[in-house]
From Swiss-Prot:
Highest taxon listed in the record's lineage: Eukaryota
Protein name, per record: Pyruvate dehydrogenase E1 component subunit beta-4, chloroplastic
UniProt region (Disordered), positions on chain: 1-34
Organism: Oryza sativa subsp. japonica (Rice)
Oxidoreductase found in the keyword field: yes
């Protein structure tokens, strides 16, 4: 992969409203100042490594249902919705680096299908916030080409399901060009957008494409679940020299949380300890984090002490954090909204068996969505997705 660390970004220079005002000479002259900022961000990431492996921050190991990092407690901070946190990340990075740009359908003056990019066109101009035709293969390919030429594009899919139309560009170009060019090209592109099972959006708008993208060489994948990690992961993804797919769940955009006023960047390869426990390790991500925490309340009342980890990094997995938890609890439950066949849970189960088999006292259980197209009718839709009661029953079975 282009760079093992997600924060080894190119030197970043001052704000600009257009690409033309940032010449190569200007970027070189400002590189020293900008590299200090990038090095500081990379240092904060490296500080959480142990022997080159990512470790979970003790600061987030609280038993709250939606814990923010301890960083948010160090200042008064401000409350934002998740989609606003994503927007803040885009604004901050676009102000600092004139090579950051946004492509997609209605991302400009309309502000995106979920208003993540609202106001960006007025701030940065139509050259950097570019409305495109309804042609995912075209503007995704354009983003890959822009990344090859030194820009840092953020490509928005109006819905993750529509990005299947750009699968060729994401797979054969985005993921592989660094390798097939012999390292001549880096592809610092972010591909993001809403996905997951919403509320009666129908099969075509309820896609979970994690399983589609995980097998593509060269891609990193992360899934945000709170305003805090949405902003931190977005900033890290933009700075990465690797292509990053950022999954945003359609039902989480209106989550509200207080985040720090000061700048912060998260590590792309790091899981989050949501709730420490002793009896069983529950691994989850995205929307299922909240189903798991709802189930955890019931489990605590029944005398169980589950440890909940939001894996966040879907590729690669943070096996250091996951492994430390398994060595403590010796039992694992994986909860995902992805399909069971070939899903993230299947890959995670395989990785755990390969690396931590000797520490398991019970078979790994995996709760996934049913392998069916998502129904439109609400009761049927709910029946295809993992519910808190199923999580409680699974933990009781594992801990027998």
């Amino acid at each position: 992969m282009a760079a093992a660390s997600s924060l080894h970004a190119a030197p970043r220079v001052g704000s600009s409203s257009s690409f033309s005002s940032s010449s190569s000479a200007g970027r070189r002259s400002a590189s020293a100042a900008r590299s200090v900022r990038v090095a500081a961000a990379a240092g904060s990431c490296a500080a959480r490594r142990a022997g080159g492996r990512m470790v979970a921050r003790a600061a987030v190991a609280s038993k709250a249902e939606s814990p923010a990092s301890a960083a948010s407690s160090k200042s008064d901070g401000h409350e934002v919705l998740l989609f606003e946190a994503l927007r803040e990340a885009l604004i901050e990075e676009m102000k600092e680096d004139p090579t950051v740009c946004v492509f997609g359908e209605d991302v400009g003056h309309y502000g995106g299908s979920y208003k993540v990019t609202k106001g960006l066109a007025e701030m940065f101009g139509d050259l950097r916030v570019l409305d495109t035709p309804i042609a995912e293969n075209s503007f995704t390919g354009m983003g890959v080409g822009a990344a090859m030429k030194g820009l840092r594009p953020v490509v928005e899919g109006m819905n993750m399901g529509f990005l299947l139309l750009a699968y060729n560009q994401i797979s054969n170009n985005c993921g592989m060009l660094h390798y097939t060019s012999g390292g001549q090209f880096k592809i610092p592109i972010v591909i993001r957008g809403p996905g997951g099972v919403g509320r009666q959006l129908g099969a075509e708008h309820s896609q979970r494409l994690e399983s589609y993208f995980q097998s593509i060489p060269g891609l990193q994948m992360v899934a945000c679940s709170t305003p805090y990690n949405a902003k931190g992961l977005m900033k890290a993804a933009i700075r990465s020299e690797n292509p990053v797919v950022l999954f945003e769940h359609v039902l989480l955009y209106n989550l509200k949380e207080k985040i720090p006023d000061e700048e912060y960047v998260l590590c792309l390869e790091e899981a989050e300890m949501v709730r420490p426990g002793e009896h069983v390790t529950i691994l989850t991500y995205s929307r299922m984090r909240y189903h798991v925490m709802q189930a955890a309340k019931t489990l605590v009342n029944k005398g169980y002490d589950p440890e909940v980890i939001d894996i966040r990094s879907l590729k690669p997995f943070d096996l250091h954090t996951i492994g430390n938890s398994i060595k403590k609890t010796h039992r694992v439950l994986i909860v995902e909204e992805c399909m069971r066949t070939g899903g993230i849970g299947a890959s995670l189960r395989s990785a755990i068996i390969d690396n931590f088999w000797d520490y398991l006292d019970a078979p790994i259980m995996c709760l996934s969505s049913q392998d069916v197209p998502t129904p439109y009718a609400a009761p049927l839709e709910d029946a295809t997705v993992v519910q808190p009661a199923q999580i409680v029953a699974a933990v009781e079975q594992i801990c027998q």
